[in-house]
Amino acid sequence: HISFTVKPSLIKDIFRQSYPYALLGFLMTAYYRIDGVLLERMLENGAYEAGVYASAFRLLDALAIAGFLIAGVLMPMFARMLEENKSIQPLLEIGFKVMLIISVCVGVGAIFYRNEIMALLYLSGDAYSGSIFGWLMVSFICISLTYIYGSLLTAGGKIALLNIISLVGFAIN
């Protein structure tokens, strides 16, 4: 016989501790994903423009996983170093440099071959969709670099600061 009891105080504590992380996830998802909806609503031929944007964004999203994975490897290292009061500067510099090299090489390469990439992947891929992809790849470099600092702030327990940054990003968007 298995018995299951729920203590309201425990549920309240879990919610209170996890709420900032849930809010951060929501805000980051909202500002990262809402562009397609805004394009569709704001432009005269919004459905077409949102489709072109979505086709280019899929590639950005897939490539951004690499930055996310590197940041995911760094976060526990940052957390351990912060807990042990060790300097995070060397790890931060190495992580930033590695991410900068990877993101600039991938980003610049994708910008240079933007039209060919879009034509190869999509039947409707043309110079216009290539230009959209090119601009998104500029943001790829920035997105990749922010993963490093985001993982450092998360490891340091600075979720409130990340929520403020995400809220400002969402408001600007």
Across the structure, where does each feature detected by a protein language model lie?
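Short alpha-helical transmembrane segments in multi-pass integral membrane proteins
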Residues: H1, I14, F57, V98-I111, ...
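Short runs within selected transmembrane alpha-helices of multi-pass transporters and secretion channels
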Residues: H1, L24, M28, Y32, ...
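Membrane-embedded alpha-helical segments of multi-pass transporters/permeases
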Residues: H1, V37, A66-L69, G107-F112, ...
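Interhelical loop/hinge segments that connect adjacent transmembrane helices in multipass membrane
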Residues: H1-Y32, M42, V73, M77-S87
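Transmembrane helix-bundle signature of multi-pass secondary active exporters and lipid flippases
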Residues: E40, Y53-G72, I102-V106, L136-I143
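Helix-loop junctions and terminal segments of transmembrane helices
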Residues: L60-F96, S103, G150-A155
